[in-house]
C-alpha cells in the first residue's frame, strides 16, 4: 500500500484518540491491579464499592470481593483501549473504529454505576470521558477515510473525446468529482469543474458551506467562460448541502437559464434518499426539463445508486 498523506482532521483526532485510549486504559489497569492486590478494597478505600455490587446478578458468587470486578475492569476498559492505541500508532483504520466502540463501552460501564451507586463526580466525569473518546474515534475514522480516498484523473482516458457532451461538477472532497469523471469517461464527454469564490475546504469551509445550504443561497463561482449552447447534452453533478442543492451549482444553474438544450442530473449525498426536490429546483433554474436524474449515496467514497 502506498504511503498515505493523512489530513489534519485525522492527525488531530488521532492525537485525541491516543490520549483517551491510553488515559482510560492506564486508569483501568491501575484500578484492576489495586483490586487484585487488595481484594477487600480497604487499603485503597474501595470497600465501599461492594455494597452497590450486591444489586447485580450472581452477586453472592462474583461480587463478594473485588477480584471479579478487577478482571472485568481489565478486560472491558483496560486491555481493549491499549489494543486500540496500538492500532492508532500503526495508522490502522481499526484504531479509529475501536476507539469509538470503547468510548461507547465506557459509557455503558458507567451507566451501570449510575444504576447501582448514588450520583457522584467520578462516575459523571468518566461518562463524559466516554463521550469524548467516542467522538474522537469517530472523527478519526472520518479523517482516515477521507485521507485514504483514491482518485486519479489519469484513470479516465476517454474524458474529452466527444466535444458534443459536457459534464459539469462541483466537489468539496473529490467524491462528486470522482463520480463526474466516471460519467464523463463513459460518455467520452468534456468536463468542467465549478470553482467557488467562497471558502469551502476544511472545517471552516464545511460550516461556511452549510450556511449557504441552510439559506438556499447561490455561492459566487468563477466565470468558466464556456458556451453551453454548443453542447448537445450536459450532465450536472452536485453534492447535496443541508438536504438541498449545493450553492455553487445553484448559482451556475441561475446563470445558465435558457442556455442548455438537454440536461441530466447526478446528485451525491450521505442519505438513503433520492432528493428529487433538487432535480426539480435545477429544472426551474435552468428553464428546462431534465432528460435523466440519478442519485447516489456516497459514504467515504463508497457509492450506491438510490433508485
Annotate each language-model stretch with its function:
Residues 2-159, 254-255, 276:
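Topology signature of small-to-medium multi-pass alpha-helical membrane proteins
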Residues 4, 12, 131, 135-307:
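Active-site-proximal alpha-helix that buttresses catalytic centers in soluble enzyme cores
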Amino acid at each position: 500500500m502506498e504511503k498515505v498523506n493523512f489530513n489534519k482532521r485525522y492527525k488531530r483526532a488521532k492525537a485525541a484518540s491516543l490520549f483517551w485510549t491510553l488515559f482510560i486504559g492506564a486508569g483501568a489497569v491501575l484500578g484492576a491491579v489495586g483490586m487484585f492486590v487488595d481484594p477487600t478494597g480497604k487499603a485503597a478505600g474501595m470497600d465501599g464499592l461492594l455494597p452497590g455490587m450486591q444489586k447485580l446478578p450472581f452477586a453472592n458468587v462474583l461480587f463478594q470481593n473485588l477480584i471479579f470486578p478487577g478482571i472485568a475492569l481489565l478486560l472491558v476498559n483496560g486491555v481493549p483501549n491499549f489494543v486500540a492505541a496500538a492500532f492508532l500508532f500503526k495508522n490502522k483504520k481499526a484504531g479509529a473504529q475501536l476507539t469509538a466502540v470503547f468510548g461507547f463501552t465506557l459509557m455503558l460501564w458507567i451507566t451501570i454505576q449510575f444504576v447501582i451507586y448514588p450520583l457522584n463526580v467520578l462516575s459523571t466525569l468518566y461518562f463524559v470521558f466516554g463521550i469524548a473518546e467516542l467522538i474522537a474515534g469517530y472523527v478519526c475514522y472520518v479523517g482516515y477515510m477521507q485521507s485514504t480516498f483514491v482518485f486519479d484523473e489519469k484513470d479516465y482516458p476517454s474524458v474529452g473525446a466527444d466535444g458534443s457532451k459536457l459534464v459539469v461538477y462541483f466537489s468539496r472532497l473529490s467524491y462528486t468529482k470522482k463520480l463526474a469523471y466516471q460519467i464523463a469517461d463513459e460518455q467520452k464527454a468534456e468536463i468542467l469543474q465549478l470553482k467557488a469564490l467562497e471558502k469551502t475546504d476544511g472545517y471552516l469551509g464545511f460550516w461556511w458551506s452549510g450556511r449557504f445550504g441552510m439559506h438556499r443561497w447561490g455561492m459566487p463561482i468563477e466565470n468558466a467562460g464556456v458556451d453551453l449552447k454548443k453542447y448537445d447534452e450536459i450532465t450536472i453533478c452536485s453534492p447535496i448541502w443541508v438536504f438541498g442543492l449545493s450553492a455553487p451549482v445553484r448559482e451556475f444553474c441561475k446563470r445558465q437559464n435558457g442556455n442548455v438544450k438537454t440536461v441530466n442530473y447526478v446528485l451525491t449525498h450521505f442519505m438513503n434518499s433520492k432528493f428529487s426536490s433538487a432535480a426539480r429546483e435545477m429544472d426551474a433554474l435552468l428553464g428546462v426539463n431534465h432528460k435523466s436524474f440519478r442519485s447516489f449515496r456516497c459514504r467515504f467514497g463508497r457509492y450506491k445508486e438510490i433508485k
